[in-house]
Amino acid sequence: MKSSYGSSSNDLHAFVNEIKGEIQLSNINLDPYSFVSPSAYDTAWLSMIEEDINVDDNELKPMFQGCLDWIMCNQNAREGFWMNSTSYTTVADGRDEDGEKDMCILTSTLACVVALQKWNIGCFHLHKGTRYIERNTEMIIGKYINEEGSYPRWFAIKFTGILELAQKLGLHFVFSSRCIEMIKGMFYQRQEIIQREKLVHDCNYKPLLAYLEVLPSKLYVTNQEDIIVKSLDSMDGSLFQSPSATASAFMLTRNTKCLAYLQNLVQKCPNGVPQKYPLNEDLIKLSMVNLIESTGLGEFFGIEIEHVLEQVYSRYEEKDFERMPMSYLADQLHKDSLAFRMLRMHGRDVSPRSFCWFLNDQETRNHLERNIDSFLLVILSVYRATDLMFPGEHDLQEAREYTRNLLEKRRSIKEKMIMHELSTPWIARLKHLDHRMWIEDKNSNVLSMEKASFLRLHSSYSDKLTHLAARNFEFQQAKYCRELEELTMWVKKWGLSDIGFGREKTTYCYFATVTSLPYEYAIKFGKLAAKTAILITIADDFFDEKGSFNDLEGLTKAVLRWEGEELKSYGNIIFRALDDIVRETANTCRTHHKTDIIVHLRNIWGETFESWLREAEWSKKGHTSSMDEYIRNGMISIAAHTIALSISCLMEPCFPHNKLKPGNYDSITTLLMIIPRLLNDLQSYQKEQEQGKMNSVLLHMKNHPGLEIEDSIAHIEKIIDSKRKEFLEHVLVDGLSDLPKPCKEIHMSCCKVFEMFFNKKNRYDSNTEMLHDIKKALYDPINVYELSEMEPMPLMAHGDEYMILPLLLNSLPNILEFKRKDGYGAMKTSMCFGRSYRVNKRVMASQLDDQHKPLKIVASQRKPVPMMQSIFAPCFY
């Protein structure tokens, strides 16, 4: 839905403090499992386990009463279904994600009503859940069948199996004849799956046995001990780390390892169990930190983020391959790659060996290749980690090529995110727009993919973080829009907006500046950086298009002397605006650092103007420079350092003055100058060839007769790739540069802007190419999904005037009524807290006298309709 948050800074910080109090990432006793979304389906299966099977039926009670309580308290009060989390989405199997959500809700609701039916409690919950199933099954299975007439594998297995169990327990559903035919088709599909697949298959990440809880017993009953017990995980006693499958395994075998696993699970997760256990606890915490940073909230949680990263780094080590079950390996690889990326981004010394161990194990690679859908998030995490590649890291290069190939094979799941990752390199993405994408992505809180659905961070945390991020984003938008208006007034004041030639890029420059910088820097210095970029654009166009050589020479000399009194027309306008920018920058530095840098700034600008004049002179004389000569001048004329150094001087701590002198720049600055120049050349060689100008691509082709233009482009791209890796290493590794970290961040932001401008095309020179991004960054309200309507059912769902009586659920009731409480003395209900309530009493309208007439009727008598012939409904056990 569209959101519009009119937050003030105080409102945001109050919300931040509220969330910090709940999340407590820096708490040393933090339980990571509190961040994981519970699974209604798996919790329902644990609730069905009997504590002791060697007792009479009327003495049976659940082993895990808390799981039954969770079901009673977590039904959607309005619609009657159960689900896992707010923005719940399932593994798409090549299908529409929202459709898969409906399928998962349907199977979860079926499991929950089966659990209530088994324990003969929660009549109102059971009634609402049954009604949801009857109302929605036809729509769900009819809408989401694929073109081949089949359903996702997991759904065909789970839906049919849980439906069989429901029938065995006496639950009957009223479906249309069309719906029944579709369900029959699903049973046929399941039969084909069973005939085609083995119970346990080394190549299948989730083999049939992972769905033990819903499999026909004939598949394993003759050799139950060998099939089930031997498949239990030697490390934890689970069946494929699936609580539901392990619950079924325990009910069938009463195996002590299963019991220990289940008891440990419930102790660790008392408020609903996740669909996978155990989980990598570092992965949970890193995923929470990743969500915070990726949605633009890192500025509020700096202490908490550093605490988590320091914890992870203290356990960091280079790993050689260690054999373990594939589900553990997948989590380990996901955690290791995410830790590598986050630790490297935060300046820690980490080696690619920490996660590239998988490259040397063919079995692991085979699993990844054969189960791309199941491991897609792991593959994506590895690919993202390779964004931060330093020179000589050949393992990272191999991992990048390998994972990119896998991602290109399977783009249907999280397609938008994958396409974004593959088409737009991380180095060419701007912070502010990336934050928006993560905020709007309903799958941003996903941890992993399991049997049927995404395992997610708990919605009670991720939803609040998402809405805080949305409010923060629109708060920033409002600030940026006001600043852009002020910047536009400045451009008009100095006559730059109607100068009559060149590119008018006020909005482009401001957009690129503030969306690339951290918000703290953007709001302090973004407008000044944009002024610098605007003037560079106009001056560059003046040298390229408008000015005579005498005009250009006169302006350059005026800048070198810093005396513009004799300038006229365009030269005068440019110099006066330049003088204003330099004075503002110098005054700001003097205020913050009590130091004068005006001479350094003038020298940097003088060097830039000289490089433009030199290019104009080469063009006028038809001079063909050497490659070295061209690069030495071109890396100055692109003027990336002019922007970066001007703003770096304002950072805290102050930029080293000796690094401001032309010819004595830091290695980071030098690399920043080279990369944008070559990026620009890749997109401008055709235009410059037509104008008779030189370019690194054209020079390389000229110096190597016989080469095609594609060969020269590939050569320049290779140089850029090498310089980019070197640049990243100098920015991210402490000790390779004397520059303070904030100054490195300014250089990184500046580089990312040029990478964005020249990613596959020249976006900066286009009048329309960036308009969509500008709208999203500065104007359009953010799109966020509604918070969940799932709320605990109140103890008395219909107020003090009514009570709800449990029904005899092994036969269909004629009528369900509410009767005045005083007619039953001290009788209590068990509606919300699912304690076993075993007094089964039906209240019929004919049994009531005039004094106790029913107050409300909720369901009337319906004739039970057999769903299908018994051949389609074999017993579960």
Swiss-Prot record:
Question: Which free-text remark accompanies the cofactor?
Answer: Binds 3 Mg(2+) or Mn(2+) ions per subunit.
Q: Which reaction does it catalyse?
A: (2E,6E,10E)-geranylgeranyl diphosphate + H2O = (6E,10E)-geranyllinalool + diphosphate
For this UniProt entry, what is the primary localization, expressed as one broad class? Answer: cytoplasm
Any one GO MF annotation of this record: (E,E)-geranyllinalool synthase activity
| Pathway the protein contributes to | Secondary metabolite biosynthesis; terpenoid biosynthesis
Question: Which residues make up the binding site for Mg(2+) 3?
Answer: 680, 684, 688
Is the keyword Magnesium assigned to this protein? yes
UniProt motif DDXXD motif: location: 540-544
Entry's transmembrane regions: none
Q: What does this protein do?
A: Involved in the biosynthesis of homoterpenes, attractants of herbivores parasitoids and predators (e.g. predatory mites and parasitoid wasps). Involved in diterpene (C20) biosynthesis. Catalyzes the conversion of geranylgeranyl diphosphate to (E,E)-geranyllinalool, the precursor of the insect-induced volatile C16-homoterpene TMTT.
Per the record, what about its domains? The Asp-Asp-Xaa-Xaa-Asp/Glu (DDXXD/E) motif is important for the catalytic activity, presumably through binding to Mg(2+).
Q: What is this protein called?
A: (E,E)-geranyllinalool synthase
Q: What is the lineage of its organism?
A: Eukaryota, Viridiplantae, Streptophyta, Embryophyta, Tracheophyta
Its gene name is GES
